[in-house]
Structures are given as C-alpha cells and as structure tokens.
Amino acid sequence: MFTKTDIEKYFMAEKSESLLFVIIGVAAILVAAVFFFFLKTHFYKGMALPLLLIACIQLTVGYSVYKRSDDDRKRNTYAYDLNPSDLKNKEIPRMEKVNSNFVIYRWIEIVLLLAGLVLIFLYRDNTERSFLFGIGIGLAIQAAIMLGADYFAEARAKVYTKGLKDFTAKT
C-alpha cells in the first residue's frame, strides 16, 4: 500500500543522491585542477577534461534536484491527503517524463562509457597519445559513476511511479 511515507522516502532519497552528485562533482573538479595545474602531463590533462566537463553536469543537476526536492515532497504529501487528483494529473505525468528521460540518460552514459573504453584500449600502449588515453580513463570513470547513480535513481523512480498509479487508481 502506497502511503505518505513512501512519498517522503522517495524525495529524501532523491535529495540524498543529488547531494552525493554535488559532492562527486566538487571532488572531480578538485582532482581535475590538481591534474591540470600540478601534474601537467598530457595524460593527466587529458583525464582532467572529462572529469571537469561531467562534473559541471553533476553540480548543475545535483544542485537543482537538491534545491527542489523539499518543495516536491511537501507538495505531494499535501496532495496525498487533500488533493489526490494532483498526484494523478501532475505528479504521475512528471514521473513518466522522468522515467523516459532515464532511458535517454542511460544510453548516453553507455555510449560515453564505451567511448572511454575504446580510447583506453586504443591508446594504452601509445605514449604519444597519452592525452587521448587520459581522456578515455576520465570519461570511463565519470560515465560509470553516472550510470551507476542513475541506475539506482531510475529503480527508485519506477517504484514511486507505480505506487502513485496504484494509489490514484483507488481514489
């Protein structure tokens, strides 16, 4: 049975994961800065590039989700008791869009992971191409992190969406 507690848990988990995204993004930026400004080899400069670029995405997405999670939680727990039609007419369509976006994100992340792995295997023994080897490692690391995080977020979103649908079908 879907309850207000399920809504609370979903948004608290969403907020926690988004904070983790922010922390990972900040850490990746710091690591990229060390690689670029202190280690300075082609390999580390190459690795810094995808770390930095994907960290910007992690910070942006993480912060925006973190910022809105409490309002979403309050709005939907309120709607659960006083206006269940809002869950049906607003929250379910929003979550269906979120779930369809996860499919897109997953394929992008898989492509980035594969691109990183291709660069790693093509240039692992080629010292003249250590920049590309570094890009491959940084890209593979960041894509794997994003893929893993989105896997859990997608699983949570599917359970939450199903709960919403079951609840609104009964009201």
List where the protein language model places each region:
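Canonical hydrophobic alpha-helical transmembrane segment
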Residues: L51-Y63, I137-L147
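Amphipathic alpha-helical interaction surfaces
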Residues: G62, Y66, N101-I104, I120
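Membrane-helix interface/capping segments
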Residues: V65-N89
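Alpha-helical transmembrane segments of integral membrane proteins
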Residues: L20, G46-P50, I104, I108, ...
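C-terminal halves and exits of single transmembrane alpha-helices
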Residues: S85-G116
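Long, highly hydrophobic alpha-helical transmembrane signal-anchor segments
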Residues: Y10-L59, V111, A115-N126
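C-terminal membrane-adjacent module
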Residues: F121-T171
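Cytosolic-side membrane-entry/anchor segment at the start of a transmembrane helix
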Residues: M1-V34, K90-F102, A149-T171
